[in-house]
Amino acid sequence: MPLGQRAGDKSESRYCGVEVLDFPAGEELPAVLSHSLSSSFDFLLAPLVDPDYRPTPGSVLPVAASDLVLGPAQWSSHIVGKISEWIDLDAEDEQLRLDSEITLKQEIAWASHLSLQACVLPPPKRSSCANYARVVNHILQGLTNLQLWLRIPLEKSEPMDEDHDGAKDNSDMSDTVDSWEWWNSFRLLCEHSSQLCVALDVLSTLPSMNSLGRWFGEPVRAAILQTNAFLTNARGYPCLSKRHQKLLTGFFNHSVQVIISGRSNHNVSQGGVLSGDENHTEDTAVRHALSPYLDYIAYIYQRMDPLPEQERFEINYRDFLQSPLQPLMDNLEAQTYETFEKDTVKYTQYQRAIAKALVDRVSDDDVSTTKTVLMVVGAGRGPLVRASLQAAEETGRKLKVYAVEKNPNAVITLHSLIKLEGWESLVTIISSDMRCWEAPEKADILVSELLGSFGDNELSPECLDGAQRFLKPDGISIPSSYTSFIEPITASKLHNDIKAHKDIAHFETAYVVKLHRIARLAPTQSVFTFDHPNPSPNASNQRYTKLKFEIPQETGSCLVHGFAGYFDAVLYKDVHLGIEPNTATPNMFSWFPIFFPLRKPIYVPSKTPIEVHFWRCCGATKVWYEWAVTAPSPSPIHNSNGRSYWVGL
Amino acid sequence: MVLGLYAFADIAADGAPHLNSAAGEELVRVERAAAVALGSRAPEPPGTLFITTRRVIWVSEVEKGKAYAVDFLAVSLHAVSRDPEAYSSPCIYTQIETEDGSDEESDESDSEVNVETELSKVTEMRIIPSDPCQLDGLFEAFSHCAELNPDPNAESDEENGWAHRDEGDEDMTGGSDAECEFSDVNPIGQTDEHDITHAVVELQINDQRFEDAEEAEHETHGNGH
């Protein structure tokens, strides 16, 4: 049964499995399953075929149990198949290699027949695994629902920095082990198949935190927790080190299922048994040898905080690719406005910024005689108008508001709002595109919320430069500046979702996505910055930036699937608003990050910097980004001439 | 629906239960000389097991008028158990969803009234046929009837309020069709369609069993390099 009840968590990581080490011969499997289920485990990782079997002509596969003994629903829900561990497709011995290929295919075919959801493949036995990958790739192309989980031990030896001698460096290189490299070689050879995933064997020692972080961007489906990884506490019970606990919590938060494996190393007595009651003792089921480990795993799960309400709301959008909005070219729908207007944190920040600007603009002495002219450009259905009027009331300043909106449908709503609130004498509605309108007077303050996930990607610079005509020479723009940021990420799932479209255009499009199963490989760096008022309003908003990212050495090698993009805006002075991870405004949900994919993921060896170029290009009718990696190996320039993705003016 | 095990009294003169024919209840399988064990208690003497399209009814042959029933909607799990280590006799093992979800079993005296109160708290029941060869057939009947009673609490696809653009260039559409296909499958480990939202591994979070160990200092140093 589930490890616990955590509000908002519906993921599969609530279900814990146990590995069957000995082949369950003679129809023992149903009994083993029943025993495990009654001991609160949820599924088995079980051998499908007798490991002593070797293929001979006409022989029948000696399976653990036929589909007459367990029904398809039981197989599908409660068994993850374990492919025979003796299989070695890169063996020197030709007979072993051939036997391995035949048997692997037979076992996978049997698993498909049973409707299993997943099978665990034995780990690569050496760093070279080309033939193994070839056979698996062949199998993958014929699968529909079955997933293959390649078993990978979670290990990485640390290179010794003291050895500067060239000869020793070569020797040291051959001794360096990083199991991530095995996984990377294998999945590259298998063309990044979406049905090839990872089952990590968690051992007693763990690599560095940065190194572990890589796996959260990979399709890890299970963590096989060895009993040897557990420590013993003062009471003789199994427990985990703090680093293992942290890793486990990370797995739970990323839908990774735990499978407990190994022999019991802790003999904890069952204190609750009434030894005096002979009748009772006889009927009590024998407790599973690994139950103390399961109890501990459940303890770690139940100790986790509930998912925050906002996370629960957004959980269905995790790693879901969306096209960015085009508010300048398209008219937004009521539902879109409705959703964004619920972001109270955003409008609180705007209200704070407007209040500060009002106080700076009009001294306390002049409050009764001075009226501030404020223009909301891109008023939508009015939330910024409301924030402005509330700021005026809060600061005691008098305000004259112009609400400029080009969407005629939103203007209808605006009229209703102003009548409803009795703001007729304070607010004038202008149904016009701010780029074409001629204002009757200059404004002291210009307020807008034209920001996209990358800051300028909804063409805020083009709009606000056009609106600068309305502003007094010493006037204030809110926002006063905004900056975009990027960082390289591993994101297997996003890559596979884009690949499913089978074209270049989708790999040259930026997506808005709530990033979840990703590895952030290096700290963010800023890309483009825009200031308002623009000191040179007639200058072009074209931009070009070259960036270099250094990945920490202890991370090891990694694969870059693309770049996560964020923004941070200075609304006014110290009032910020943004989603850049280091400075993100808490509890805001108007923006998800943006993702710039690479057509081909780029392998980055350890200690090698990444060099990336970003361009912001402007045409007569559209604005677009181009991006390319030039080191460690060059990629094509993505979205050349805006051929795949652009934002309409 | 009724959660938990309950006493059943509507038995005809020939010992067969009256079915709710008006509600479409039909008999699927009868098993003579089957014992039941409730929770960790000793098995009751053999009776007759009736599996209908809606519930499992067991009628005692020794004690007139004694019978138990449980709706299939409350049976969250059923499995064949043959391992003597798990249970001494081959049997059908079932888990029953109860009203309060508590695993607590009282040690109260064995009076008639208390027995009846206790029924609703039973979370495990084993059906022990006198002939173990009948287990597979019983399991099949259980599976068939469980499918006839899907969980009404199964999660519905509520549409989230988040904005999705339908207009615009179709090529720009994000998201993946594969996503929808995959999410239709139950997660590995989930029992049939019954998502038991309140039956979980029971622990006392402040249980001293889960204290951290003293971690060796050399390990810390090793990781630091």
Swiss-Prot record, chain A:
This entry's Enzyme Commission designation comes to 2.1.1.320
Name any Gene Ontology BP term. regulation of DNA-templated transcription
Which family is this protein grouped under? Belongs to the class I-like SAM-binding methyltransferase superfamily. Protein arginine N-methyltransferase family.
Tell me the domain of life: Eukaryota
InterPro entries in UniProt: Arg_MeTrfase, Arg_MeTrfase_PRMT5, PRMT5, PRMT5_C, PRMT5_TIM, SAM-dependent_MTases_sf
Q: Name one GO cellular component term.
A: cytosol
According to the UniProt entry, its GO molecular function terms are: histone arginine N-methyltransferase activity; protein-arginine omega-N symmetric methyltransferase activity
Site residues, Critical for specifying symmetric addition of methyl groups: 340
Q: What is this protein called?
A: Protein arginine N-methyltransferase 5
Localization, per the record, is: Cytoplasm
Q: What is the gene name?
A: PRMT5
The family database entries (PROSITE patterns) matched by this protein are listed as: SAM_MT_PRMT
Its source organism is Oryza sativa subsp. japonica (Rice)
**What ranges does the record give for the region Beta barrel, renumbered to this chain?**
479-649
